[in-house]
């Protein structure tokens, strides 16, 4: 949930809250790209009786830019519809759900997939079944099989899944939001004069046993790329502008044109780069308008905070921030992609347009030995070259903001020793569900009986 509840307005609207975005060359199908957009943050597995579902009144989209202008060339739209078998019971299910057409499953959801390519709309599929939430051993005794039934194969080599999955993003939210007292380094924190937190401690994964709702689509690379093998990817959620309460029906009715309320490209951008007063605005704009926020990338608040919160630990970073040096390294990583010639044998440059998008060079094959630190760990198949489900994006970005990537654009700069070591103490092994080696790659969701 690298972008969960990150802005005041979207924090009130979880079904439209885009929490994570992944884009990678499929490790088991290397002629395809997998795109995954997660929504609905911090789902408690035992959250009945209604559990969780996508919003019938939300337009979910995954966008692809294949010519570097920060605007969509291909968009996949997902619209959902909830159908009740029996509106006269409060039960989500009336017995074990053994298949997607089980008569015991009351609160079902179906969806339509539409592709818009260069302005031309094409409905790819309709009435595709989502799986239920993972309730427990009596209600969903073989959830993995139910989820597999919900993997749908469409014409053109496209595969889709839309439903609950285990949260794959790992982060110590408790320490991060407690004035960044990162547990492995908390003894070095300023601590505001308090004589506490005087020894290092292991990180705690705040998302270890929560679920999300994922929209996953696997598409042949040949159906996405243009002249450049690098794709720009982002997701968005939109609502219609007018909401009217129908007292007789006891429900809201939406009408009018669609208005974007959530956006996500690179992880943690709206979370830690964009200031509080601009977060809601940022969510409504396309990536091509990122120039309006360029100063926050050039002079990021977090890079100035780290030396203040950890006195004496980041002296070189402090000098960089005090000098007002433009962080061209962060602009490249997050806004344009990294041009060729900076990292030997690597580039994911889309052009001069500043746009917050995941940038994936589809010509780079999956790694046989993935390193969750991605490019800074010597693995060009990982973040910021797209983003794989196991990539440690918090630590990668934290180290980048701490200055470890400055030498990419300024060979004279020496990162502080701490810049290459700072972390919240978590790794991909901190995810109890683990990850799958095949579509949809995120783990089986935690069930409500065993994970209350």
Task: Explain the meaning of each model-derived region.
Residues 1-452:
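Surface-exposed extracytoplasmic segments
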